[in-house]
Amino acid sequence: VIMLRPTQSAIVFVQQLGRGLRKSPSKEYVVIIDFIGNYEKNFLIPIALSGNYTYNKDALRRFVSEGSLLMPGASTINFDLVSKKKIYESIDRAKFNDTKIIKDSYLHLKHKLGRIPNLADFDLYDSIDVLRIFQNKTFGSYHKFLTKNEKDYKIKFTPLQEKYLEYISSKFAAGKRIHELLAIKLCIEYQENIITRLKERLLNEYKIKFKEVNYLPIINQLKQEFATGGAKATFQDAIFIDDNLNTHHQLIELLQDSIFKKQLLELIEFGINRYKTNYTNTHKDTDLCLYQKYTYEDVCRLLNWEVNAVPLNIGGYKYDQRTNTMPVFINHDHDANQGGKYLHRFVDASTLICFSKPNRSIDSDEIQRIYDEANNHLQIHLFVRKNKNDTTSKEFYYMGQMHAINEPFKVQLPDNKNSAIQFTYRLENEIRKELFDYIIQKY
């Protein structure tokens, strides 16, 4: 089957493809050759072929990269290099948090159901990832999206109620850890002794032991004392617990609105289901899952830092004394790595060459700490992303813990003005082959 067509709709493309697959009974296979048109929207091709309508850029890039590895059954797919390049460029340009994409996906699901979808419906019917709605700066919550775009939605909340919904939506609804979601649920259900009840519920229902290191960061998030910098003011009034670790009187008053309470609980259940689906298989004694994706803020939170760190202050890596942890963030750029030896780069799937921040000495506390981690028990965690210019998916793959090997040495940086210390890390877990290939390849 040869297809020559513009790329306008993932759904129409699949329907066209389905017609071509009606092979005769005597034929064992069919080959489809697709000549891609309309380069602006050819990101719809991996969406159509993968059936992944979440509009997650990195997931689409990986599908184009890995193709047949991710296809179910006996089907195979191959993209030539020019097609890969064009599709990657289209994915990079696309704005998947765009209101039109969100509205079109919402309307398609609404027409399918014959009613306003609830949060769980988006996952149940493989529609757009609701996180795209939460991450859209115009909305921030499903309630606000419906208020602006659904004429049949008549529910009104106060600005403060909306802030609570937006805070949970943006910070916890992805389900990357159960603790905060469960704590907020307990604030609604019991209103007293929240942390004590949280410890009991975690152990009894999830077999998770509440660690002492969890205590401060979770309380700080519930009291709006975790955020720093300009972000601190955004949700400063959405307070969940008071100084006695009971539900804050302000929230108790707002919960008198039964519809608000219902939406809070629905949002929390959505996050808990995401957690159960994606994040229960934590690595070693951490709250992180190998090969899952995390933002800078996610990492600070899940490593149990007392307060968040502004990304600009992290600068590639940052040490937290209270938890004795140091996350290392690598932006892997194939073209840049081809051009300069003084850039972070992989030697193989378990070995990484890294550089310190400028003008450090080998004798500095920072470098000595890294090389003495066997004695000081420093935990060094690696996070890698492929394209730092992606404004939608600002997330890194978690690759596990690593250890410094060989001797560090001083190098002069390409600008000839600054020096740095070069050192080598060995990962505890070799990076999964298909993920490693995806990260290091150009297309």
Regions found by a protein language model. Name each.
Residues 6-53:
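Conserved segment of the helicase C-terminal RecA-like domain
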Residues 49-185, 198:
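Long, largely alpha-helical accessory region at the distal end of helicase-like NTP-driven motors
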Residues 113-117, 188-197, 332-345, 390-394, ...:
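Short, surface-exposed beta-strand/loop "edge" segments at domain boundaries and coil↔beta transitions
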Residues 161, 166-168, 287-395:
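Acidic, glycine-rich low-complexity segments with interspersed aromatic residues
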Residues 168-175, 179-223:
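Long amphipathic alpha-helical coiled-coil/heptad-repeat bundle
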Residues 389-443:
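Compact mixed alphabeta submodule
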